[in-house]
Regions:
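N-terminal hydrophobic/helix-forming segments and targeting peptides
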Residues: 2-310
């Protein structure tokens, strides 16, 4: 059992109700927690979360369906389908042909974060920065003085002039949002509001010249990872704290990690689906854009779930 205390910050805390004797966890409980922490680490963005779930579903024998193809599904079959690479539906059909009921679990893949603006390059006082926009209901103060990396999806044109998309994750600290030194801001420990437009531009390093382009940095990173990139067309990127999930407390009764809202529910729903041995119909849906109202094609207010059920 997990009792959750969520703060919409760079790092959240969950209270664990797992320990049998208040100190030691069973091997199964520890294995489950290790899997959860690995899933969170591998999922810095909704695109990576869906890719992580796809990997586990493929290993479990699930077959991928495509919206552009005619579906041929069988009783007892196990399938999944994605939309925008950020929303996923996975389901197991009952052994009997007639579907009388379906057990469903819902979650969402997105979390509050700092997203990179379309034209983010800023040079100020000899330093290179990137402009960001707050996504979702985030606490802003905890984003300061963190080691930040960058991840998301990049759309490119390859050598054959085809548009392709790639996941990208720098997996190392490349930026930070430094706090102002106390002797320059004597009121820092009192009431202090954060202006996202002036206080949150992310620091990349010393100024890199007027011709600096984030798209060039993305292209170089993708090429270093074996992708053919002729031109970066567009991107959807967000910064994340590189600090790994950890069990903290004298008895390790707390799980501290980013994106617990709502990757925790995604992981619980996925593992429940994969571990189930029932012959009844089951479905897991993990939507995107919950943090901004779900009003999108891949959000919960969209038609994705209904179209899959139909």
């Amino acid at each position: 059992m997990l009792y959750i205390i969520v703060t919409f910050a760079a790092r959240n805390v969950a209270v664990l109700g797992l320990c049998n004797d208040g100190i030691r966890k069973t091997m199964a409980q520890q294995t489950y927690l290790n899997g959860l922490m690995s899933f969170i680490s591998d999922s810095p963005t909704p695109f990576h979360a869906v890719a992580s779930m796809e990997s586990q579903l493929n290993m479990a024998g699930y077959s991928q369906l495509h919206v552009s193809n005619t579906w041929h599904v069988e009783a007892g079959g196990r399938y999944y389908i994605t939309r925008n690479d950020s929303t996923i539906v996975a389901f197991q059909l009952p052994q009997e042909n007639a579907i009388q009921r379906m057990h469903m679990v819902g979650a969402h893949t997105d979390s509050p974060c700092l997203k990179v603006k379309p034209n983010p390059e800023i040079q100020c006082q000899g330093y290179q920065q990137l402009g960001v926009e707050v996504y979702g209901g985030a606490l802003l103060h905890p984003w300061f003085d963190r080691d930040l990396s960058l991840a998301g999806r990049v759309v490119c044109r390859d050598a054959s002039n085809q548009l392709v998309s790639h996941l990208i994750d720098f997996k190392r600290p490349i930026a930070c949002i430094p706090s102002l030194a106390i002797h320059l801001d004597r009121e820092a420990n009192k009431e202090h509001s954060v202006n996202p437009q002036t206080d949150l531009p992310v620091l990349l390093g010393q100024a890199l010249g007027d011709d600096f382009s984030l798209r060039s940095v993305l292209a170089d990173e993708l090429k270093a990872n074996g992708h053919q990139v002729d031109q970066v067309i567009d991107y959807e990127l967000s910064f994340y704290d590189v600090q790994a999930p950890a069990l903290v407390g004298l008895k390790e009764e707390f799980l501290a990690a980013a994106r617990l809202d709502n990757l925790l529910s995604c992981y619980i729903g996925l593992t429940a689906l994969l571990a189930s041995q029932t012959d009844q119909g089951m479905l897991l849906i993990c939507h995107d854009h919950e943090e901004v109202g779900s009003q999108s094609a891949e959000g919960a207010q969209g038609s994705f779930l209904m179209s899959v059920l139909q």
